[in-house]
Each structure stands twice: as C-alpha cells, then as structure tokens.
Amino acid sequence: PERINPGDKQHRLPSIRKVTAGSNSTSAEFIDQLYQRIITAGTHKASSIKVAEAAKVIENTQRDLNIALINELAMLFNKLGIDTREVLDAAGSKWNFLPFSPGLVGGHCISVDPYYLTHKAQEIGYHPEVILAGRKINDGMGAYVAEQVIKLMTRKKIAVVDSKILVLGFTFKENCPDIRNTLVA
C-alpha cells in the first residue's frame, strides 16, 4: 500500500517504512527485496495483501478519528467560551498527548479510506459506530466553519449577502496542490 506524505519535505518515500505483501510467498519476498533497495527506513513484510491493505486503511481511519475528536472538542469549547488552541497547548504539555488540530478533513485518503472499511464491515453485518460517527463529524465541519464565519460577520455587522470572502487553504494540507475531496468548495 501507498505510504507517502505529500508536501512533507522531511518524510519522503525512502524515509517512510514500507509495508509489503504479495499474492504468494515468492512474490511477497521479491516485492519486499525490491523495496528494501529503495526504502532506507526498511520494510515490514505483512503475511498477506489483506493485512497490508487493512493496515493502510486503519492508519488513515485512526487519523480521521483523532481529528474528529479534536473537531468535536473544538465545537464544545466554542460553546463553552473556551479557547481551543489554548486548551490544546496546555494538554500538549503532557508527554503522551497526541497533537491534532481541529479543521477540515479532505483529500483522497483520510476522508475516503474510513468508508472502505465501514462498507466492508457492513457487508459482513457489522455496524462500525465510532468510525461512522467520526466521519459524520468531519464531513460536517465545512458547514460548521461556514456557520461560524456567518455568525462572526453578523456580530461585526458585516453584510453576509454579496460579501466576498477569501479562503486560504483550498487543498487538504499545506504545500500540496491536490484538491480532491476538498471541503472548501
């Protein structure tokens, strides 16, 4: 499975450990050896293609859920009149706090991969509640941000109708030209 980080100048293809697999032991070994020549960070040979692909899907699903948690907390703190950034800075002073920021989740992986997993789960009769709840929160963030902008404009007595608003950050992450599944549009 693909493991790249577009726009990241530090974590490039050779420095990201690669999960490999094959349809049989011969092809798995060949593929693993091939990638070991390119990937200086090393490889992790999975026992099957299913395991390798499932690993990729949960990497992105975990990130999506972590962002959904922070998004939900940001909406809650907003209602409580507490500065989310200040809370995150304070919580980040603990060594094992995971640093995530609230915001829109788009792109071709993080916002899509959880749906592959939930679709497969539902095919076998399992209802993945937490994953779907996270997707619902993140899918709704575009509307939430728009509502907050309108509320702020109204409070500042800025006419909403016919206003022009500059949006900085149309892609799913900085320094990346990919606009697939952007929540800004």
Features from the language model and the residues they span:
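Structural/interface elements that position substrates and couple domains in central-metabolism enzymes
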Residues: 1-185
